[in-house]
Each structure stands twice: as structure tokens, then as C-alpha cells.
Amino acid sequence: MNILVIGRGGREHAIAKKLQREDKVKTVYCAPGNPGMSGDNIRTVPISEEQQTELIQFAKDNQIDWTFVGPETPLIEGIVDAFQAAGLLIFGPTKAAAIIEGSKSFAKDFMQKYQIPTAEYRVFRRLAPALEYIEQQGVPIVIKADGLAAGKGVVVAETKTAAKRALVAMMEDQQFGASGQTVVIEEFLQGEEFSLMAFVSNEKVYPMVIAQDHKRIFDGDAGPNTGGMGAYTPVPQIPEEAVQQAISQVLKPTAKGMVAEKRPFQGILYAGLIQTATGPKVIEFNARFGDPETQVVLARLESPLSEIISSLLVKEQPTIAWNELASVGVVVAAEGYPNQYKTNLPLPEMSGETIYYAGVTRSEQALVSAGGRIFLAEATASTLEEARKKVYQTLDNYSFPGMYYRKDIGVKGLI
């Protein structure tokens, strides 16, 4: 079969690479992809994610059997609806269903309605009452831009000054444009975070193995939030009982609730969870694979991804098997990220390693950096300790000036 993957990051590289290795897959195209993907026989297509008409035409012209959407923005802009209207098979939620990620206020109200465990919250559309609420509630407190903000729209404020500064930046200074005109303010939850993703087809939920990602830029979870600096799986400090609880109290009622709301969800549902004293609670929902969690979770998927998605697209039950291995992925970023950083850093040739490229471009035949997060190095082994050793050994061998990465990815799992 011929498959089109939409997106350009490390997540899409991992999805495309997984598909490319499977027996029933003939060609994997990635639009627009990135130059780092071509070494894996993935054909990149110079059409960007928002060019719906051109993508539909490409799918028709190239006998694409089905399309997979990686990033959130095209989903929220209705790419699935457009493909379906053109009579094409595509795996991902419609615009109506992708709102679970596109609007945090929708997601919070939805969770309240369907009794899905989450933090206490209030939604504000005006600055003055939001500032007043901070005065009443005290800190620490969490402030979230309602719409998409590339993973950077959440502030955990330790002081009232920081909380107010975040509100002014979002609501008055338009830091995230329209995304920050409405904000959600919620209680700060204490506990261990984990990511639980699932293949979803209307009310049917097929959970994946859990992972833990590292959002902060510095070791020890210090510094500002990023798009993610690394991930690992399994997460031994999260008991199996908590995972089962999250499946029954979060994923299943969410899938059912979306059907009840006439927003049936088909695609990848991602629950960002925190294990509290009273069980798992939802921090956020995403309507797609997480990045960097995908790069480690797919390393543990034994069944062909192409067959799972092909089954779901025709409403058949897929066969899904996971291995017992451990996987650790470490993001290499440009020094200074997520603030000011240099681009055009020359990258070393990396052969035989599992590297998923993100912010890269080609300059005179060589790969150079073109973004904050440049690539993710992944290693799989029988234990987390071994996988950590392997991945950091790779990074030691391939160091280059201007690179930065966290040294503690997966340490929390070494219990």
C-alpha cells in the first residue's frame, strides 16, 4: 500500500520509518517531511501541512491508500473533513472532534460534564476577573492559553507576580494571538506525570503502553517548558493499577462522551495524566501522537502499524501486541532553546543509529540545524538502564558545537 504521512517533525519521522519497514507497505510519502528522513527511504513531498487542496490532489494522483496526520494544527483546521469530503481515507479526528485539543476550555467543561478526573478550574475571557481570581486562590497555580500554543501555552506560576505576568502576556499582549484571549486557570496538582495514548475508533479504545516525557529544558525538571526534551517507556513508578484506572475512568468515558456530543473521535487520543493521591487526573488531552513520546512508544509496538490503522479505518478490530523492552529517547536541541538559539549548525553523519530528525534542512549536501529541537536519538534495550547507557553513548560519539541535551532522561524510572 501507499501511505501519506502529513507533518515534518521527529514524530512523523518515527511514524513514517515504522510504516516503511512493514511488509504490506510499498511507499511512504511525507508532506512536507524534512531532509533527514530521506535516508530511510521515505519520500518527502514539498507540500506543507496547511495546503489541503494540494495534499488532496497529491493523494489522488499517487494512488495513496490512506493518509495519516501527525501534527495538531491541520487536524484543528479540518484536514480530515476535507479529505473525507474528497472521498479519501484518512486517519485522524475531524475538526469537531479535534476541539478536545484545540480548546482547553472545551476539554475542561467536557471532563466536568462526563465526570472525568481533572484539576479544579475556572475559565476567563476578561483580564480583570482573572487577576482577581489569582489574588483569591494564591499560588502555585496553573495558567493555560485556551488554544494552540506549540506546547508553550502553559505556565506553572510559583508567585502571584508570575501568575499575573502570564495573564497579561496572554490576554493583553496577545503572546499567543487568539489562542490566549481565553484562559483556563486551574489548581496545581502534585504527583508523577505520565502519557497514555490510544488508538480510538468512536467508542472503541485500544490503549498503548505508557511513557513519561520531560517538558522542562534543564536537568531536574528546571527552567521553562519546551515541546519536550525526551521520553522513556516503561514507567515503573506508575503502578499498573493506575494505568487501568486511567483507561476505565479517562480514555473510555472520553471516547463515549465524544460520541454522545456528536463529535465521534477516530484517531490517536493522548491523555497527559498525573498520578495523585486520589488516582490519575487529566492535565491535558491531545488529538494526536505526542512528540517525543511517539518515538519511544512505537519502538515497543510489535504489530504492524499499517495493519492497525487499516483495520480501524474499516471499523474492524485490530491486533495489537507490545514487547517488554525499554526505550529511551533524548532530544538534541540548539543551545539557547526554547529562547534565542542559533540555526545552521552543521550536523555529523549518523549512520546505523536510531535518529529521528525534526528541525533540519540541507545545505550543500550536508544536514544543518533549522529549528530549536534538531533530532531525537532513541535506544531500545531489555532494561531502562541499558537503554539509557546506549542512547547517551550515541550522543557522546556524535557531539557537535552548539548542541544541548538533558542528561537525566529516564532517571526517574530507575527505581
Where are these regions (language model features)?
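Internal nucleotide-binding/catalytic subdomain
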Residues: A157-G290
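Peripheral (often C-terminal) accessory segments that flank ATP-dependent C-N-forming ligase machineries
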Residues: S310-I415
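Active-site nucleotide/adenylate-binding loops and adjacent lid/helix of ATP-dependent enzymes
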Residues: L4-V5, G102-T182, Q212, P236, ...
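Active-site "cap" helix and flanking loop/linker of ATP-utilizing ligase/carboxylase catalytic domains
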Residues: I247-L269, N286-N344, M350-G352
